[in-house]
Amino acid sequence: MASKKGNRIVIKLKSTESGHTYTTEKNRRNDPSRLELRKYDPIVRRHVLYRETK
């Protein structure tokens, strides 16, 4: 039986400097555009910009 498509989806956040990725969830209704967050990148050992990828 197919379930109803929910508002929350799993996305990948990719570092703009090293290529490191985080996975997180976002709400389709509240955040329809691509997400950009500053998070810690363990490869370059500092906070950098992470952008949502498909």
Swiss-Prot record:
A cellular component term, taken from the record's GO annotations: cytosolic large ribosomal subunit
Keywords: Ribonucleoprotein, Ribosomal protein
PROSITE patterns in the cross-refs: RIBOSOMAL_L33
Pfam families, per the entry: Ribosomal_L33
Biological process annotations from GO: translation
One Gene Ontology term of the molecular function aspect: structural constituent of ribosome
Gene3D superfamilies named in the record: Ribosomal protein L33
Highest taxon in the source lineage: Bacteria
Keyword tRNA processing assigned: no
InterPro entries on file: Ribosomal_bL33, Ribosomal_bL33_CS, Ribosomal_bL33_sf, Ribosomal_zn-bd
PANTHER family: 54S RIBOSOMAL PROTEIN L39, MITOCHONDRIAL, LARGE RIBOSOMAL SUBUNIT PROTEIN BL33M
Protein family according to the UniProt entry: Belongs to the bacterial ribosomal protein bL33 family.
Protein name: Large ribosomal subunit protein bL33
Native organism: Chloroflexus aurantiacus (strain ATCC 29366 / DSM 635 / J-10-fl)
Gene (UniProt): rpmG
